Each structure stands twice: as structure tokens, then as C-alpha cells.
């Protein structure tokens, strides 16, 4: 970073790398004039693991366990976009029950990262108590994940054409109980935080991003919706079975850190609304006995190549990517998570390009923090919600 001659009395401070449980291994080189920020340069790459090149040397089925290490707090979304890409290329139909289960898991996986965003964000601006509150609700979500997938994190639950296993007996009732419980806790968060005068003093009018500025920078997710743009890929791309549910896109028009907070709080409420509707319409009810259904169905007169390759065979199945290219995206908690996939009639992808929302959103903080106070850096950075696993890949 070059320092101008007129800034010879300025101070250069290195902030970070931060602990992975907070904002990840991100380093900021900040140029200060007293408490005023003159310049800020983010240093990335500390968590780079070559995820794109690894994908090109694995089959898609072999690569599935790797993708949960991108955004390690919202692993269902990385799995979803990974299986959606070959499903689109191969025109594979997903059963309605599996699609409903996917939606339920995705929305639970949206709430959990928003909770883990809220706790450190409040800690960044000096309020420690909410961190303990969000841990209480987040543990219940992880209990539901563990019961359904066997893992609290890094679930490896999605499969090409569906999910790994059906929901266990009694899981849907437990999930409905959580929905009733969690809404009261969101109201508790709002009573505790939203109208707190000290909180408002720290976030209101801080880190303002205008509508056109958000579009020009390619922002997505809560960063985009907090700037007055009603853009949500669940409404735009019509993936899974989101079109069958009644829910609203959460957005604000102020574009500041408070607006980004309000968008995420609203999204948690909308996620509960989607989960309740999915649990209500899921085919087969609380537990579907697939073995009994298969016996009742009898033998199919036509050869089912998909079932032979993905269900009947004991060895690890393979999926040959057709010689096409496709861009698939999902609405992750942090924004648009996309994959550009190029196939060449091989079991290995020819190109696997990851479009992480955090990497794009992290380009704008240097513009936001200029002329702000040093204490506002953590407010702005916290409101963006950064996970370096997906930024560095």
C-alpha cells in the first residue's frame, strides 16, 4: 500500500487475521489519521485450499464431502448447489418428498448461520449477552441436523437425485416444536436489540450502500436487499419447490448496517414460515416406508438406468457430465452461491468455477470505511457476514 506524502503522519495498523470462529482469517491493513480511517486494504488467501482444482480431479460424488468446507456454517447450501449442477446437466428429476426435505434443511441451515452472525456482530459492537442467547437456539437446530443426517456440522446429506436418507421417526414433530419455540425467541431478540438506543447509535447510518452502488459492485443476499432491491433467487430461479410456499422477500431501503440487521432478522422469521408449510405438504407424512412402497409397486417393465446406477449398485456411483456448460446458483445466507460447471463426457468435471457471495461482498468494505471512525470498521465488517472458507476456497 502506498502512502501519500501528505499522509506521512498517518499510522498503519494491521487488524487480524481474526480467529476462525469470528470473522475468519481475514487481515485488514488500515491507514489511520488519529481515529479517522484514510484507507483500508483487505488481505485474502490465508484459507485457500484449491477447492476448484480438487473438483476437477474427483467425481462429483467423491467431491461432495469437500464442499461442506467452503462455508462451514451453512453446509447444506454448498451441497445443494453441488448436486443441482449435475441434476440440471443430466435432466435428473428429484422426487417431491426429497425436494421438500431439501427445502426444510436449507431453511434450517439459513437460520443457523444468521444466528451465528448475530452473536459475533453484537459482540463486535460491545454487547456480549446475545452471543449466549443465539447459542441456545443454534444447538437445537444442530440437534435436528444430527438426528436427520448423523452430523451436527459438515452434514454430507444431499445426493444427486435426492437426499442420503429419509427423515427419522418423530423428526417432523420435533421440527414443528422448534418452529413454535423459535418465533418467540426472535421476538425476544428484537425486544432486546432492535430499539436499543446504544445499538442504534452504533449501526444506524453506518456503512451506507446505495441501490445503484450495490448493483455496480455485484452484491447479493442481505447486502443487496438492504439497499432497496427485492432480489431473492428462491423467487427468481424457482428451484426446488419454493414456488409452492407463501412467503415474502425481506428487504430494506436504507442500505446501512441497521438495514442489513433487519433483513436477516426478517429472513429467520420467513424461514420458519417456509419450514412449517413444507412440513405440512411433504408427501408420505412424518415417515415414508420406502421399502413397503417398492414391494407394492412391483417390477417395472422398463429398464430404469438411474436406479441401477444410483440405488442398486454397491460400489460408489459415478455421474458422467455431458459435454455442456451450465451455471447453477442458490440463495445462500450470505448471497448468491453459484457454480459454473463445464463437462466433457467424463466422470470428472472439465471446469468447476465457484462463485462465492462472500468474496464479492468483501470487495466493498474499503469504500465504506473511508472517512469513518476506527470503531466503525468492525460494525461494517460484521454487518457483511464474512466466512473466509468460501471467500478463499
UniProtKB/Swiss-Prot annotation:
Keywords: Chloroplast, Membrane, NAD, NADP, Plastid, Plastoquinone, Quinone, Thylakoid, Translocase, Transport. GO terms for biological process: photosynthesis, light reaction. The keyword Translocase applies. GO terms for cellular component: chloroplast thylakoid membrane. InterPro entries: NADH_Q_OxRdtase_suD (IPR001135), NADH_UbQ_OxRdtase_49kDa_CS (IPR014029), NDH1_su_D/H (IPR022885), NiFe-Hase_large (IPR029014). It holds the Pfam family Complex1_49kDa. The keyword Ribonucleoprotein does not apply. Gene3D superfamilies: Cytochrome-c3 Hydrogenase, chain B (1.10.645.10). NDH is composed of at least 16 different subunits, 5 of which are encoded in the nucleus. This is NAD(P)H-quinone oxidoreductase subunit H, chloroplastic. It comes from Cycas taitungensis (Prince sago). The gene is ndhH.
